[in-house]
Amino acid sequence: MSEAEASGGMAHNTGPDEKTLQVLRDMANRLRIRSIRATSSSTTSHLTPCSSAAEIMSVLFFYTMRYKQEDPENPDNDRCILSKGLPFVKVATGWPGQGLGAACGMAYTGKYFDQASYRVFCLLGDEESTEGSVWEAFAFASYYNLDNLMAIFDVNRIGHSSSMSVEHCIDIYQKRCEAFGWNTYVVDGRDVETLCRVFSQAAQVRGKPTAVVAKTFKARGMPNVEDTESWYGRPMPKERADAIVKLIESQIQTNKILVPSPPIEDSPQINIMAIYMGSPSVYIADDMLSTQRACGLALAKLGHENDRVIVLDSDTNNCNFSDIFKKEHPERFIQCYIAEQNMVNVALGCATRDRTIAFACTFAAFFTRAFDQLRVGAISQISINLIGCHCGLSTSDDNPYHMALEDLAMFRAIPNCIVFYPSDAISTEHAVYLAANSKEMCFIRTSQAETAVIYTTKETFQIGQAKVVRQSDNDKIIVIGAGVTLHEALVAADELSKEDISIRVIDLFTIKPLDIATIISNAKATGGRIITVECHYPEGGIGGAVCAAVSMEPNIVVHQLAVMHVPQSGRCNEALDFSGISSRHIIMAVKCILMN
């Protein structure tokens, strides 16, 4: 260690001496200077919120946290989430309100799965305290006694365009945190000595997460800019920035830096690579089983193959059959209750640094609530798996609120997200195993309606590989489906064969990536005629995907059958027919196209 370095970190049982405190103050000012220089070179600027938290960041990174700077992926490192809208290493938090949920996932993994010493810190801005997802995370952390988690509120009073509703009424933040069962401290966010003491005390608290409410000021240390409302998003003129930098530099008393203490190396060695199906499928042809039940059985089976497989649920486990996993692996089942945004964030946190294989389950329709969390998870390139049950009209006994008819459009729009849509129990089991082995975000769309097993146990499946489930040399048209509509297509094929009309039926299996080669080659073999039939609105679903895939191919025409209006409650077969996607409507479409 050089003369200009000193050891920081919570390895010390006593508080910092005055020299260490001064180094921390100086490092906070250096952070301000770097923030000024970085933001001044941009056409937009988030300078003022960067400056308000400088002391917090100085103490956190150079006194409190334990980590190896040269090994940022080390599983024993403490974790930090900057939920003020700033990205940090593994989790891009995007719009404020998402970071604490991801921090909860990391803390849960550390406490219950890794049973390790690392701690998790999350810096939040006061403006994001108006986001409901923050308080979903507060409730989760309190319920699960995440005493290895600390949330730090940077209460600088000013939001994007105006003052916050409670401004600097620190006691309001304190009461809110305490009401959720958190150990809470109120501090002056500029006082490094108090920050050091409080951060150290929090490490000794057991059974509760800790919240630190820090009163700060935007643009701290900048004359005529500090605590004003007119500077958010504005770049500072170079001359003014240079003058402020000189002023701050004059306050720096030492050139020393602090080196963080190394982590306690007690995280277990794990392996989440190459998970295989331990035993063959037990299903036989024509067994009747819903794909969502098959998915629950597959998850439980997968849990026996690797002890890092976890399942998160939003109080729907008795509907989506994740309760099967819960019964067989209760220590790896996380009940998130009806808080879908937080469930997705927790799953993202659990999956960071490849510590778990996470599956988050709820009604497919309810994932629309968490779309922002999903898109930000894709930006972070974190591998999680989402299972959406009760898709489409298969849940038509319920009301339209439960019917997911937009979910394919949502998940197809997420970069690099793999979208599975299995049609029977065997393909569902393969989808679960393929998702577990994927390094991308995956969505598995499952149905409530019982459908027949159509594949044998010897069938193999691959991501991006469709299946031609019915064909002959005399086929005049292709019908492409998935899920319940594939079975409607097979019924239609049987009926049409009685009239000597042969059609080819394709099961897409994955909607994204799409098996373009199979679609085009079979279309060319059947006169360039394609019908897509889907239990989804026409926008963004199977029809749109197929149309895009063949758009550059001459002499191929696609006819789309989809749910064209808001559905009504009823039996599944009635709802399919009412919406124009039943076997009867497929037969009519085939005849109409062939006549023309």
Segments (PLM) and residue ranges:
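Thiamine diphosphate
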Residues: 2-121, 253-445, 450-451, 460, ...
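Short hydrophobic segments within beta-strands
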Residues: 123, 152, 312, 361, ...
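Residue(s) in the substrate-gating loop at a strand-loop-helix junction
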Residues: 126
